Swiss-Prot record:
Matches recorded under PANTHER family: PRE-MRNA SPLICING FACTOR, PRE-MRNA-PROCESSING FACTOR 6
GO terms under cellular component: catalytic step 2 spliceosome; centrosome; ciliary basal body; cytosol; intracellular membrane-bounded organelle; membrane; nuclear speck; nucleoplasm
HAT repeats: from-to residues: 384-416, 418-444, 445-476, 554-586, 588-620, 622-654, 689-721, 723-755, 855-887
Annotated source species: Homo sapiens
GO molecular function, one term: protein-macromolecule adaptor activity
Protein name: Pre-mRNA-processing factor 6
UniProt lineage: Eukaryota, Metazoa, Chordata, Craniata, Vertebrata
Coiled-coil segments: none
Amino acid sequence: MNKKKKPFLGMPAPLGYVPGLGRGATGFTTRSDIGPARDANDPVDDRHAPPGKRTVGDQMKKNQAADDDDEDLNDTNYDEFNGYAGSLFSSGPYEKDDEEADAIYAALDKRMDERRKERREQREKEEIEKYRMERPKIQQQFSDLKRKLAEVTEEEWLSIPEVGDARNKRQRNPRYEKLTPVPDSFFAKHLQTGENHTSVDPRQTQFGGLNTPYPGGLNTPYPGGMTPGLMTPGTGELDMRKIGQARNTLMDMRLSQVSDSVSGQTVVDPKGYLTDLNSMIPTHGGDINDIKKARLLLKSVRETNPHHPPAWIASARLEEVTGKLQVARNLIMKGTEMCPKSEDVWLEAARLQPGDTAKAVVAQAVRHLPQSVRIYIRAAELETDIRAKKRVLRKALEHVPNSVRLWKAAVELEEPEDARIMLSRAVECCPTSVELWLALARLETYENARKVLNKARENIPTDRHIWITAAKLEEANGNTQMVEKIIDRAITSLRANGVEINREQWIQDAEECDRAGSVATCQAVMRAVIGIGIEEEDRKHTWMEDADSCVAHNALECARAIYAYALQVFPSKKSVWLRAAYFEKNHGTRESLEALLQRAVAHCPKAEVLWLMGAKSKWLAGDVPAARSILALAFQANPNSEEIWLAAVKLESENDEYERARRLLAKARSSAPTARVFMKSVKLEWVQDNIRAAQDLCEEALRHYEDFPKLWMMKGQIEEQKEMMEKAREAYNQGLKKCPHSTPLWLLLSRLEEKIGQLTRARAILEKSRLKNPKNPGLWLESVRLEYRAGLKNIANTLMAKALQECPNSGILWSEAIFLEARPQRRTKSVDALKKCEHDPHVLLAVAKLFWSQRKITKAREWFHRTVKIDSDLGDAWAFFYKFELQHGTEEQQEEVRKRCESAEPRHGELWCAVSKDIANWQKKIGDILRLVAGRIKNTF
């Protein structure tokens, strides 16, 4: 047996043996081990395999099937809620119905996620805020301290000690290099020897100077050390005196540069040298490189085309903005040499030069350009003395006598008499200047002015201003009958000379005449041009727009003339009479209004509103008999008019003539038995405390008009006043059966239940009302307030969110939602409200109240003005505005708000109606109601 042969060779390997594993070797596979690639249809090596297993494709299918069957259906992979982790049917075919099912499940998941999204985001937000409160950042911890750093003064900053150094002593206290000043003896030796020394010989410091012994140890002086040749001054002599002189010269040059001001005076303060330097910093904002590029570019333009004026002007302005004023002056003067005929270059040179130099520049410019008006004007501006200005302008007029600008400038400096003489010459030199002719006419007497204007018409037959001035002249001298003729002749003459009559321009001229006080002229112009260029069917609409435009421009006489002309053309148009009446009511006198209304009812006797306006005007003036007579005439023209009957009743009841009012109502019920007549009859008895009569009338009215909700409301309120809650509830319920869409009825029934403590029933009533009247903001608002009054703020907020989803454009809901929010969130909510309801008066009122609560008085007043301007009929806005002025305004502002409210006569508003429709306040005036409503308002928002 061979001893070298290992005994385990040829023996089978033990179980689990991997060759080379003990020494860290790993196995690998090469291409030769795998063999060539095979197709799926190639036969496998096992040629005797059964059918279905002979090809590579068969083997792959077999392996895939084995993988599909190898699903983990163990108990450990099973969950009671979700089932197995994998899909039990993943091996099955994925068909169209599977795809639809997956889409449905995905939509459900998405929907469920959206339902919880708001709550989840809120919870995450709260958790983040809680985490930040518990573990604030270092930056947040020191934020309040950092704000206090603004209070630290500069002295306190400087007194703060330096931060301590924690390094060791060797690092903290390094040995600084000791610098010793060079002694004068060193310079003296240098001057004597002519050598350049940069350091001191160590032997000199050791042995004390120049008598250093020879290194060999002997005391013999160094050979040649005292040789006379070494005493010769060297070529590098340093003259300290000359260095000091050069330094002083350099400083003088810098001071002289800084001291050059615009006026050429030396104003440098040596102590404030640095301050002066700072003031000379250029004020331009460009980059230095950009300025250099611009300078090079402009230089190239100047060199390429030296006779191009804009290049010189641009170059000078570039140097000016960079602070190099003298360079700019030099450049522009060079430009005047290269472009002596350029007006702009000379004007720029005069602008850049100081006073006296600028005058010299302008004088030189006049020699080159004796016809330039702008240069003469600039020369006059440079003069400070009036006589010098006159002299310059007169000299200019000798060279340019046909310049209107020069004449106007010269006339402005003269006294009236001299100006008249000068204008006489001016119109000869400039006969086509309308301004000069009109100026001369203003300075002349009446007779001479007429002659001047006639000459002006001969010279300028195409200008309308001359004719209008002539008309104003006649009106100013009392010849009003000539005004109409002059304007008519003006239209005829201008058309004959081929001038197109521009209606808009003439209306503007009429407005100017109105503002100047020439009433007859403005009315004549309006009558002459108001119908020019308008189609017949558009006349009424266009004229009403013109009248509104004149009112907006504060040209009231023009508007009055338009209405007068329109009433001549349309005498039977009720709308035109009404617009004219409202115009007189707002901008005219009571006499003019009554005169207009008398004419109006004569042309439109069937227009009830015109009769009523006339009667009301008389009543407000205290003339009750005249008001009665007007209403009597109105009865004759309109025998069965409900409005006139009720106006007559109101007139009598307001003047405490209750029996006459009862008789009128009885006649009205017999001749014009309308629901409103019955309602006024019930109210009259109610306010007189005749409850039995009021109830009888109410029952009679309901037999005729059971679908009129106000009658049911009055019946319920009368029962409620008598503390008969069951009968009141019954009345409201009966009314709701007949009028299920009446919001006030639902609100009265709900408040009745709340009043007697039936909160659940009140809530149910409001829910029922919202079902019968969807998208009703008033019902949603009452539901929110009901929960808020009950102390259930969370439910109130939830209801408000639902209300805004159903009624996203309701201003009254948004205004309530603003004040349901906490104070920090109100501003954001108000922005959202303004985006949704930009012009809603309730939202504007809420924003005004928000600014009021934040003590932003000016902004609050501005928003109150916006609110009452958008809707002057909202009484709540006036009440809040008046309350605001009572607290923060002056007496004049309070009185102004009260007067505006009385003229607006508001009729709507939740708080306003609660007071104005109260039986106890039925005879109160608008001003009294305003004070009562303002008194009920509390600053709790």
